[in-house]
């Protein structure tokens, strides 16, 4: 908080005519002293009053949101002093992309003015709302006042959740060795899910409704064990990513991880969902269930940044902590097979992997994921190739930061009603 003299001209004129009055007394000099000195005193007192009596309060409804949510902020500018603030410049130091609350406004003496600002949260991440700097001054521009308000709050923008109807997760603990055995004679006809027909599958395991719907053969994945935990392993090694800006494989991987976690926890098919990622900071969230855990996963994904740990090393390190008979969902843009030995080693613990390959060619890279998908197919590991088009899905889940939503069977999000708690919360 400071008050600054913008120009020395007025004080200089005042002292000059004061000196002239001392050297050559005259009523003219006296009048000029009164005029210049009075103006100097008045503007100084005016600025001092603004410095002492201007206050700004910032309030938000939520301190977390999801991509696509609307951020609304309320500002209250108070001037309880005896003079008006003919102009007040508000400088916003928020870091949310595409959002600025900066403006110029005036406020009368002993009065209050309130306004709102709005923005759409377009990018996941952790941002700050506030602080704020107020600049004002007297109407003649002799003095300026600058007031810094440090109050701020953290806004977490979590990734969107999108429907993934074609991704089917291999159930964990199949027959004790982590993989389905399609030729075992004692399999039942109770199917937990389906996968593409592979060489060696028994024709009697063909799932005809899915085959007819998709135009190619699908086999039943039989439920040989109770629902197991899901571990989502997200590869954010910066050396294997493709794409530019916010349309890249890191963002697609984060969205896929968020969507799978949301799907698993809402369907309550797995006992719990865990998250493993090694970016600039390691994320290790053991499998749990419930809404609180879902939000914890989304917050961790919101803060995730690419690191330098290769997928093979991440799987080797994580192996002893994953437990047995679980479903492991690997999300990666790596098209080199150097991490596959680390993955196959986990099969002997009863870990059933499902691999989501993000096709780098859809992000402008020269190579695609087809060759690696073929290697995984030979090993009998379910794999899905996903591309850049998922980032443009209009059905992206807009979250609960501002409204409450329901998802239609087609995956479209429809607002149902505002959330019950719409109270304003002050920054600070």
Predicted regions and their residues:
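Detector for methionine-enriched segments
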Residues: 1-3, 20, 42, 158, ...
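Extracellular/lumenal glycan-associated context and N-glycosylation machinery
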Residues: 1-57
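Short, structured coil/loop segments at alpha-helix boundaries
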Residues: 6, 22, 26, 95-96, ...
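An amphipathic, basic-hydrophobic helix/alpha-beta surface used to engage anionic
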Residues: 37-284, 327-331, 345
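Membrane-proximal, solvent-exposed terminal domains/tails of membrane-associated proteins
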Residues: 181-428
């Amino acid at each position: 908080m400071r008050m600054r003299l913008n120009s020395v001209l007025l004080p200089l004129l005042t002292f000059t005519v004061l000196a002239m009055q001392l050297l050559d007394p005259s009523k003219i000099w006296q009048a000029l002293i009164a005029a210049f000195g009075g103006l100097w005193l008045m503007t100084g007192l005016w600025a001092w009053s603004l410095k002492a009596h201007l206050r700004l309060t910032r309030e938000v409804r939520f301190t977390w949101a999801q991509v696509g949510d609307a951020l609304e902020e309320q500002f209250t500018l108070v001037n309880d002093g005896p003079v008006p603030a003919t102009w007040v410049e508000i400088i916003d130091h928020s870091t949310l992309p595409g959002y600025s609350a900066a403006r110029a406004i005036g406020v009368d003496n002993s009065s209050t003015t309130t306004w709102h600002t709005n923005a759409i949260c377009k990018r996941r991440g952790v941002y700050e709302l506030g602080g704020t700097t107020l600049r004002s001054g007297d109407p003649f521009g002799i003095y300026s006042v600058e007031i810094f308000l440090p109050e701020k709050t953290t806004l977490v923008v979590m990734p969107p959740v999108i429907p993934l109807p074609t991704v089917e997760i291999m159930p964990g603990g199949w027959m004790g060795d982590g993989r389905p055995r399609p030729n075992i004679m004692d399999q039942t006809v109770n199917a937990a899910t389906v996968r593409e027909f592979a060489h060696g599958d028994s024709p009697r395991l063909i799932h005809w409704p899915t085959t007819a719907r998709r135009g190619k053969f699908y086999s039943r994945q039989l439920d040989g064990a109770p629902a197991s935990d899901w571990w989502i392993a997200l590869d954010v090694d910066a050396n294997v990513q493709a794409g530019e800006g916010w349309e890249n494989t890191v963002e697609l991987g984060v969205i896929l991880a968020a969507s799978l976690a949301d799907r698993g926890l809402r369907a309550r098919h797995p006992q719990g969902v865990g998250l493993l990622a090694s970016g600039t900071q390691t994320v290790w969230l053991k499998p749990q269930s419930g809404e609180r855990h879902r939000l914890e996963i989304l917050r961790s994904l919101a803060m995730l940044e690419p690191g330098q740990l290769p997928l093979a090393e991440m799987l080797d390190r994580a192996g002893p902590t994953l437990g047995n008979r679980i479903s492991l969902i690997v999300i990666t843009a790596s098209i080199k097979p150097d991490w596959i030995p680390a993955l196959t080693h986990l099969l002997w613990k009863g870990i059933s992997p499902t691999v989501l390959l993000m096709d780098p060619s859809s992000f402008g890279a020269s190579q695609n994921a087809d060759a690696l998908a073929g290697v995984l197919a030979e090993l009998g590991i379910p794999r899905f190739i996903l591309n850049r088009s998922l980032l443009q899905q209009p059905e992206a889940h807009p979250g609960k930061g501002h409204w409450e939503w329901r998802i239609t069977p087609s995956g479209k999000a429809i607002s149902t009603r505002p959330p019950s708690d719409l109270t304003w919360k002050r920054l600070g």
